[in-house]
Structures are given as C-alpha cells and as structure tokens.
Amino acid sequence: MLKTTTKLLVASALVAGLSTAAFAKDKVYKWKLATTWGSTLSPFIDAPTNMAKLAKEMSNGRLDIRVDAANKHKAPLGILDMVKGGQYEMGHSASYYWKGKDINTLPFTTMPFGMTAPEQYAWFYYGGGLELMQKAYKRHKVLSFPGGNSGNQMGGWFRKEINSLDDLKGLKMRIPGFAGEVLAKLGVTVTNIAPGELYTSLERGTIDALEWVSPSMDVNMGFHKIAPYYYTGWHEPATELQFLVNERQFKRLPKDLQKILITAMRVAAYDMYIQNYHMNAVAWSKIATDYPNVKIKTLPKNVINAMKKANDELLVEKAKESPLIKEVLKSQKEYLKKAREWTKMADYKYLEDNL
C-alpha cells in the first residue's frame, strides 16, 4: 500500500509543477525526529519511519529526516520538550502524555467513551479538530498533526479478575490520559510508565494491572505470561498518535517541502492505522489458538456505569480549567452526536444484522 501511495503522491507533485529535475541542486534539509517508541515497537515506530521515507522520496532527497527511537535519546516521555526546545525538529508520540504540563493537549489522543477512529479522523480533517489542535499547541510554538491510530484499544491485563467496584480500590495500574483520572476517581492508584519498563513493572508487582494497546503489540510484550485476565476496552476507542513539528523550523522549509511533509505525515498516519488493524486481526486468532490460558473478560455493567459517571463529572471539571479545553470538548461532543447516528445506522446495524 505504501509503495503504491508513494507513486501516486510523486505523480501528484509532478502535476502540481514540482519537477524533480528542478530539485537536483537545491538545498538539502537534514532533520531529526524523536519518538516515544523503541526501535522494534511496530507499528508505532513504523509511522515516523515511513513518513521520513515518503518525505525523502517525494522531495527527491531534499528533505532528509533521521528517526531516533527512544532507546537512542533516552527520553520517551519528553518528546514535546525536545521539539519545543529545538533539540529535534520533529517528534512522534501521544498528546496525552504531557497533560500534566498543558491540559489543553489532552483530548487530541482519545477520550474515554468517545469517538471511534473513523469518527475522530472525520472530526480532525472535516470537523475542525485539526485547527483546534494547532490552537492548543500554538503556545509551545509547535505544530501538531495526526500521527496514526491504534483503533479501539483493549482494556488491559490484570492479575486478578474485576467483579465489582471494590476490586478497583487500591489496585495499582499503569494507564495514561484521561482514563487514568477516571480510574483514580474510583480508587485506583494510577501511574504512567514508559513502554520499555512495562513488563518488568508488572512482573515485579510494582503494578497489578496495565493497559498498553491491543493484541498484536500486547502479545509481543509478553503480558499474557504474567497477567491472565485480558479485558475489553472502554477508555481509548480511537488512540491517535501525534507528529510534532517545531514551528520555526517548519517555516524555514520552502513551500513545496512544507506540503510534502504534511502529505507524508497524513499518508503514514493512515498506513499505521490499517497496518495495526491487520496485525490485531492476526494476533487475535493467535491468542485463541496459542494462548488458551488467557481469559477474555468484559468489565461488569455496574463498573462501566460508575466509570461513565466519573468520566462525565471529570469532563465538567476539565471544561472549567481553560476556555480552550472547554471549546475542544464541546466540539468533540457535538461532532460525536452527529457522527454516531451514522455509525449506528451504517456500521453497527450492518454488524448486528450479519454476525
């Protein structure tokens, strides 16, 4: 898919008058991109890697972006600071990792009980979401773009079964973003741990449960070996990663390279979304055949209802923290109301009638 898309994009660039012959002797812009992910953490690491490849090919080598994985720069949760400070021209991470520094950036990854991936992409590109995200990052002098979606994530791996709200009290769990605040309200001790430390933290009992992503990435991390209960999701229905770009460096690029970079980011983001979907489909069947001891569970209805209540209360509180987050949450709520009616009529009804 990526090779075919690259050819189409290059052809489009030529039609637009970006002749590669004219590129030959132009200045080469060498950039660096820092990621939250390790060098083998597919498909997350694939999004920036493919983006850099596309940008280089479409620019005939004029935009050369080196991708540094977390095992090189050693600051997996410091991506915003490094891009903002100019150590890196670009970054690839998840916006909710720095909600403690700037609450306005929180909603752009995903929100509990929120939009699905198609709904959220429609909001970003046609419902005003992208403009709101740029508005949130403007104070950091950073541009932000969708960077690939994991789809609906699983609810996490637990050492013990959750049968009631009492089972959540005192539970130590790694879960980032707004979902962590929801669980904290219900008595969970919440922490955020970098990806490379997740397995050892669960193995040593530093945490009792963790949420990572979905079957393909979770199985590769080996969580099924130490926590047998695997819960369906509620908290991250459309986890969108983010490309971050230093605004000053972006403005220094010629206009054609700016357009090439934006296009490369958009294509790589979509490619990660469908790549991850494929990987999860393969991994799900593998769990059923190779790991029969994994127990697939759904949280009890009374627990889900308590989470929804806590989520609604927290949203009201967050909306009071800044005019911008109030605007973003209002935009998401209004778009979801409109989009969900079509989702129910199209996707849900189709599945209901044909499963």
Outline where the language-model segments fall:
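Sec/Tat signal peptide C-region and signal peptidase I cleavage site
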Residues: 19-24
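Bacterial N-terminal signal peptides
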Residues: 10-17
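Bacterial N-terminal signal peptides that target proteins for export
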Residues: 1-10
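N-terminal secretory/targeting leader peptides
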Residues: 25-120, 130-355
